[in-house]
Amino acid sequence: MPAETVVFGTVFMDCKGFAAYRYDPLGRNVGSVRFIHGGVGRNVAEDLASIGAKVSFVSSVDDSALGLEVLNRLKNEGIDVGHVRRAPSSGMGLWLAIMDQNGDLAASISQMPDLSIMDEIVRSEGESIVAGCKNVILELDLNDHISTTVLSLAKRYGKKVYGITGNMEVILRNRPMLGGLECYICNETEAGRLLEREIPTREPEAALALLRGYVDADGLKSMVITMGEQGSVYYDAVSAESGFCPSIPTKVTDSSGAGDAFFSGTVEALIRGFPLGQAVGYGTRLASWTIEVAEPTRTLLPGNLF
C-alpha cells in the first residue's frame, strides 16, 4: 500500500555529549557521549511511524555501515525508504551537540549533507512521488529549488503541505512560500526572525496577538509557535480558531527532539481531521513523551497518542 504521507528531509548523525553536572562552557565537563541517528526529516518520519502513520521518506544517506544502519532502523519502523539514495560521501549531515545537566541544548555545530543529491531525486522522481501520496511534509530549508519545486508539485496535484523549519535561511529569502502550506510550525526564536521582533513567551495573549496579526497580514492558512516550557500558541485563519496550549510538566532527559515530535503529533492529528487546538494538544503530548528519553525520537511510546 502506498504511503499516505511523504517526508522530504535530511538525515544527520548526531554526536551528543550529556553533562553529568553543571555545564561549564570554558572548562572540562564529565558526562557521556553518544552517537545517535538524527536529522529533522528523519526524526519526523520516525515520529510519525511511531504513532501509526504510513510514511515514505525522501532523503539521502552515506553508502557506509552507518548509512545502512540508519536505513535498517527506518525499515524496521515500517517506513518506506525506496526514495532514500546512498551516496559515496556527504549523504548525511553531522551535528555536534552539548546537552547541559538539565538535558537542554547548550551548544552545537552542524554540517549539512550535500543537498544536490536530494535535488536530483526531486528533479527525477519528485512528480511521481508527490502525485502518489496524500500529504507532504517538507523540511523547508533544504534549498530554494527543492522547496519551491515540491510546493509547486503539491499545488498541481492538490496535496496538502505541512512545513517544518531547518535553519530559516530559505524561508527568509522566500517568505511567500509559507502561504502554500496547510500549517506552518516553528519555535519562538524562528518566529522572532520571521516577524522581526521578539516573541513574548511569558505573555501568551500578547504572543497570540502577534501571531494572528502576522498570519492575517501575510495570508497564511494556519501557524503554531512553540515556546518551550511556556507552551504554544496557535491560529487557524480559515476557521478563526486560536488559543494557547500549556506544556506538560516532564522530567527532561534530552530536549533536542521536542520540536520534531511536537510537529509530528500535531500534523498527524490534523491529517486525521482534528481541529488545530486539539491537534496541538496531541503534539504537546508526543513532545512530552519524547524528551523523557536520551534520543530525538521515542519509538516505543508509553501509550496510544490517539
Language-model segment annotations:
Residues M1-I79, W95, K251-V252:
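Glycine-rich phosphate/adenosyl-contacting loop at the front of the ribokinase-like
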Residues N135-A209, Q230-G231:
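Conserved beta-alpha-beta core of the PfkB/ribokinase-like small-molecule kinase fold
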Residues S128-I129, P176-M177, D216:
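Structural alpha-helical scaffold elements that stabilize or flank donor/cofactor-binding regions
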Residues R86-A87, A97-N135, L140:
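Conserved phosphate-binding/catalytic loop of the ribokinase/pfkB sugar-kinase fold
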Residues V58-D63, G82-M92, G166, V224-M227:
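Beta-strand->loop->alpha-helix junctions that form or flank phosphate-binding loops
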Residues L48, N187, G259:
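Short, conserved phosphate/pyrophosphate- and ester-handling motifs at nucleotide-, phospho-/glycolipid
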Residues M1-V6, N29, V170, R202-F306:
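Conserved phosphate-binding/catalytic region of the ribokinase-like
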